[in-house]
């Protein structure tokens, strides 16, 4: 089958395994809190993020409170996640910008979101697709990279280039699904160290 047919079939097969695919980030109740969760999750497991956000949102539930938070307190709360010092600075700066310019609520536009400190193409699209199914782009993390390259959907290694390769293969209406499904498949089945072979789909199409 050609690359577009393979991409379509792969998504269908993974969707059979995870029909209700959604984020594994927890403890959030508002769009602002969800954005903070995603920002903290870069290069860090969702499980680790979930350990810190309960305390973080218990003390700082919204952009207003987080915008005036003491940097040392935030750093201390999130110190168990990777790059915690940088992330602490970013979430406070983002909270200030959102409070001043958007009444504390993150915008629903992928370009506007990327103007916030610590929010890139991936973070913006995870936020928009998981919350709103907005289909403004495909978010690519390490799991999406592995799945896409393993099945030959891309030869690129740069996440942004891979995102654009996938956006050419999938109809826009399906963009929101790609990250959610590929992440779960890559995290639990097509794992980096050892694949769960009996659950791997379309084995005959694997190129890596």
Enumerate the language-model features and the residues they cover:
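Catalytic cores of DNA base-excision repair glycosylases
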Residues: 2-208
């Amino acid at each position: 089958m050609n690359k577009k047919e393979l991409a379509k079939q792969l998504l269908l097969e993974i969707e059979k395994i995870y029909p209700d695919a959604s984020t594994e980030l927890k403890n959030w109740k508002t769009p602002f809190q969800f954005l903070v969760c995603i920002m903290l999750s870069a290069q860090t497991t969702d499980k680790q993020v979930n350990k810190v956000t309960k305390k973080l949102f218990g003390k700082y539930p919204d952009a207003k409170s987080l915008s005036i938070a003491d940097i040392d307190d935030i750093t201390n709360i999130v110190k168990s996640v990777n790059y915690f010092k940088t992330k602490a600075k970013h979430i406070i700066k983002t909270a200030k910008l959102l409070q001043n310019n958007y009444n504390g609520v993150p915008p629903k536009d992928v370009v506007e979101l990327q103007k916030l400190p610590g929010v890139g193409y991936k973070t913006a699209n995870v936020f928009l697709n998981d919350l709103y199914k907005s289909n403004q782009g495909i978010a690519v993390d390490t799991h999406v990279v592995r799945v896409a390259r393993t099945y030959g959907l891309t030869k690129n290694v740069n996440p942004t280039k891979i995102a654009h390769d996938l956006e050419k293969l999938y109809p826009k209406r399906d963009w929101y699904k790609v990250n959610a499904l590929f992440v779960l498949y890559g995290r639990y089945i097509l794992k980096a160290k050892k694949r769960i072979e009996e659950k791997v789909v379309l084995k005959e199409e694997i190129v890596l």
